[in-house]
């Protein structure tokens, strides 16, 4: 069978968790970064500090890690910052843009910090995992790419996918599509879907009404 690898990263936890579970039955590897990764770090018993983490799904993530049999690839380092809750509440993007960044191993995330992008070692790990892939689905950015200093992971993944030789590369989701377009890579992908919700439903294995109707046409 041809290698199928997938990168999932998003704040839409419920749907993304379902996507990951569905992809584990089809993909050779599922690479998880962005906000979703911290729920899986927590599931491994790691400190995540103030990083976005959906506690209601930690136990579910533990189950996915157990059934994945090594298919799930998680970041090994992250770009973190320390910002006060008050500054974040007042102006999140402004606060993190001014904050000093620190690259830390995922096992050493400080309780007062939050991860906002994957680190350089993770970028190299993901690029290595993508080598030889024949089909790749990318959904969601690797970090807070709206702020330049936290866009390196997203840019690196986008560039790596755009330059994969002989691979079918599909972007599902508005943020990923926006990142690819902003980097001028929109013509380097096999297909870009800007319908984030519909893309996620399809990746969950659900039937899309429009597609179903088209399939029924004789």
Positions of PLM-derived features:
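Charged helix-capping and loop-helix junction motifs
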Residues: 150-159
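A short, aliphatic-rich alpha-helical micro-motif
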Residues: 6, 24, 130-131
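Single conserved hydrophobic/aromatic residue that forms the stacking wall/gate
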Residues: 1-9, 13
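Active-site rim loops that border cofactor/substrate pockets in soluble metabolic enzymes
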Residues: 70-135, 141-148
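Short, conserved loop/helix-junction motifs that constitute active-site signature segments
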Residues: 23-26, 159-167, 185-187
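C-terminal functional extensions of proteins
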Residues: 49, 54-63, 68, 79, ...
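Acidic, glycine-rich loop-and-beta core segments that form the ion-binding/anion-interacting portion
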Residues: 16-75, 81-82
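Glycine-rich beta-strand-to-loop/alpha-helix junction loops that act as flexible
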Residues: 10-11, 32-35, 139-142, 170-175, ...
